[in-house]
Curated annotation (Swiss-Prot):
Gene: mnmC
Transmembrane spans: none
Record key words, sorted: Cytoplasm, FAD, Flavoprotein, Methyltransferase, Multifunctional enzyme, Oxidoreductase, S-adenosyl-L-methionine, Transferase, tRNA processing
Organism: Escherichia coli O1:K1 / APEC
Reactions listed under catalytic activity: 5-aminomethyl-2-thiouridine(34) in tRNA + S-adenosyl-L-methionine = 5-methylaminomethyl-2-thiouridine(34) in tRNA + S-adenosyl-L-homocysteine + H(+)
Protein name: tRNA 5-methylaminomethyl-2-thiouridine biosynthesis bifunctional protein MnmC
Catalytic activity, EC: 2.1.1.61, 1.5.-.-
The keyword Isomerase belongs to this UniProt entry's keyword annotation: no
Recorded GO MF terms: flavin adenine dinucleotide binding; oxidoreductase activity, acting on the CH-NH group of donors; tRNA (5-methylaminomethyl-2-thiouridylate)(34)-methyltransferase activity
Region listing for tRNA (mnm(5)s(2)U34)-methyltransferase, in residue ranges: 1-245
Cofactor: FAD
Length: 668
């Protein structure tokens, strides 16, 4: 069985208050002066104080083996802040730290360890506040208003480095080779790790490590680093430093899922919903010039315009990519929304998904068998449902304690206002008719004979994504649906959590004393007119799922208050994020892919044309992480996702999977 929970660190604190691993019988940092040792070994060993002012790029990337208590990261963050204060006009503006940890500390142990260094408290408190759940894979933390990016990879570093996407190759400017001593933890210090470090190292990259062990020096030399010894810290005689002085050949392991970015830093986004808004912020943070073209007279008039939407992950025992993506997307979304400096109605009240019939009960039982962290999802018996939700249902289920609801329309509008303050240009009532490649950019033709030219274009226009020649073959479909707005009653007012069944019901929004109930589902439809039949169906599904609940029968839809929208979806329930694939070229280039994988060229795509679509009914959960993934890809920065899960988001995936099996592919 695949487990989706990571074992926490098994540690104790010694007489000096230093954390000690029980499993490895080694300290996390020196009893004497761990802070000064970090500054000497890792910051000094990589010459960071001298390199920061001369760095020719806006981003500096550091990778580390063994996050532990985060001492190395916090010390580096402090030094980077001091550099930025002393050199405000320097080219280098942002720091990206990538670290691997097999046994992450609990938040409580982390906070206890941080008491050792009061001078690091301002940085440590931010880290503790965002400390992720013990889930495998990459957890991206945006710190210091996005100037600091921390990618925490939970799992075995030798396994994780083999699962990294090729976009991480040659991105690292400095390596901190840390961890428990080689004699205590020999499984980490392998040639496989040294080779991975070399693969990820940018030409000119450096490394430093506290050990001077001969097999470590020889292994790093074999991987491609030029190594030398340096005086060790304190009583340690020697340590090792290295430089990547060569450019290593880097074969692409899965060229059919290759992702390309752009160095142009200027883009147009087509859309006006949550995807467009969050991507705008992510690109602006990276220094892009961004222009948004919205077909409507105001933002959030499409699928992002609902009053209340539920936030919780989509899980399935039989789909590892879906589980990995949505569990990490959900936790990222919560961190992101909590730090977002804009106002929007929301309540992290929890979400309870109920087993209202045999099929749904079986599905929930399968989800609960996946060894999920209790902070993410936990079983709830029928007799406890009323206590935690406030209403009687006579059903058991699964509760997502960190879930809840938010107002997508208000979120989208206010995020766009924030983006405008940061430089976003917005044009409303610009309906894109077609686009074509022109010189080194894209010519956009809008209704009313309006034109514009941009270096890079992102299509984030929901169900209208496939209306252009470049996207007409995409395997996406429209889903029309109606959400009913119902007045509260004394019984409904007791509802404390979002209920999910064969539909969903939100607690009341105290701003309007209404609940949302929905949604109807019409695959292939783009109808947005009010439907009395849908209104009645939304009510009836609630009654059918909870036939003994009197409060359900009292739901009143007679006011005919509702909102109709159209979503864009895929049959595998995952978003499509990345380069727009060239359908015709894909069929030609990959006609013999099943027999000639070794000869495959890089995925045929349209240069400088990207897409952010098919968020389906889980856009509030997936959009923040997808925006971060796409902005990182476009900016040629490290992407916070393992290769196989990232491939499951590739817009060409459904075609390529068939071609890899030698099956025929049809458009749409």
């Amino acid at each position: 069985m695949k487990h989706y929970s990571i074992q926490p660190a098994n540690l104790e604190f010694n007489a000096e208050g230093t954390p000690v691993s029980r499993d490895f019988d080694d300290v996390y940092f020196s009893n004497d002066n761990g802070l000064e040792e970090t500054r000497y070994v890792f910051l000094g060993g990589n010459h960071l104080e001298a390199r920061f002012p001369e760095h020719p790029h806006p981003l500096f990337v550091v990778a580390e083996s063994g996050f532990g208590t985060g001492l190395n990261f916090l010390t580096l963050w402090q030094a980077f802040d001091q550099f930025r204060e002393a050199h405000p006009q320097a080219q280098l503006q942002r720091l990206h730290f990538i670290s691997f940890e097999k046994f992450p500390l609990t938040r409580a142990d982390l906070a206890l360890a941080h008491q050792h260094w009061p001078e690091l408290a301002p940085w440590a408190e931010q880290l503790q506040a965002q400390w992720p759940l013990p889930l495998p894979g990459c957890h991206r933390l945006l710190l210091d208003e996005g100037r600091i990016t921390l990618d925490l990879w939970f799992g075995d570093i030798n396994e994780l480095t083999s699962q990294l996407d090729d976009s991480l190759n040659q991105k690292v400017d400095a390596w901190f080779l840390d961890g428990f001593a080689p004699a205590k933890n020999p499984d980490m210090w392998t040639q496989n790790l040294f080779n991975a470090m070399a693969r990820l190292a940018r030409p000119g990259s450096t490394l430093a490590t506290f050990t001077s062990a001969g097999f470590v020096r020889r292994g790093l030399q074999e991987a491609g680093f030029t190594m030398q010894k340096r005086k060790g810290f304190g009583r340690k005689r020697e340590m090792l430093c290295g430089v990547m002085e060569q450019t290593l050949p880097l074969p692409c392991s899965t060229p059919w899922f290759n992702r390309t970015g752009s160095n142009k830093q200027e883009a147009a986004i087509i859309g006006g919903g949550i995807a467009s808004a969050l991507l705008s912020l992510a690109l602006l943070r990276r220094g892009w010039q961004v222009t948004l073209y919205c077909a409507d007279e105001a933002p959030a008039l499409g699928a992002s315009g609902n009053r209340q939407g539920a936030l919780y992950p989509l899980l399935s025992k039989h789909d590892e990519a879906l589980n990995r993506f949505f569990s990490n997307a959900f936790t990222f979304a919560r961190r992101f929304y909590d730090l977002l400096p804009v106002k929007f109605d929301h309540d992290w009240c929890g979400v309870t998904q109920l087993g209202w019939d045999e099929k749904s009960q079986h599905k929930i039982a399968q989800m609960l068998s996946m060894d999920l962290p209790a902070e993410l999802a936990v079983a709830v018996e029928a007799n406890a449902v009323e206590q935690i939700t406030g209403v009687a249902t006579n059903c058991s289920g699964i509760t997502y304690p960190q879930g809840g609801w938010l107002c997508p329309a208000e979120l989208t509008r206010n995020v766009l206002k924030l983006a405008q303050q940061q430089g976003l240009q917005i044009h409303y009532q610009y309906q894109l008719q077609d686009l074509s490649r022109k010189d080194d950019g894209w010519l956009l033709n809008f209704a009313g004979d309006q034109q514009a030219t941009h270096s890079v274009v992102v299509l984030a226009n929901g169900h209208q994504i496939s209306r252009f020649s470049q996207t007409s073959s995409l395997p996406v479909y429209s889903v029309a649906g109606q959400v009913s707005h119902i007045p509260t009653t004394p019984e409904l007012a007791e509802l404390k959590q979002v209920l999910c069944y064969d539909g969903y019901l939100t607690p009341q929004n105290t701003a309007n004393q209404h609940h949302c109930i929905g949604a109807s589902y019409h695959r292939g439809s783009e109808e947005t007119a009010y439907s009395d039949e849908d209104q009645q169906q939304n009510r009836q599904r609630l009654i059918d799922c909870f036939p003994h609940a009197q409060w359900a029968k009292e739901v009143d839809v007679s006011g005919k208050e509702a909102r109709c929208g159209v979503r864009c979806a895929t049959r595998d329930h995952l978003p499509m994020v990345g380069n727009v694939p060239d359908y015709d070229a894909t069929l030609v280039e990959y006609a013999s892919l099943a027999e000639k994988k070794d000869e495959a060229v890089s995925a045929p795509v349209y240069d400088d044309l990207f897409m952010f679509a098919a968020l389906g009914s889980r856009g509030l959960c997936s959009a923040p992480l997808c925006a971060e993934i796409l902005a990182a890809q476009m900016s040629e920065e490290p992407i916070p996702m393992d290769a196989s899960t990232l491939a499951a988001l590739n817009p060409n995936r459904l075609w390529v999977r068939k071609l890899l099996k030698g099956k025929a592919v049809k458009a749409g």
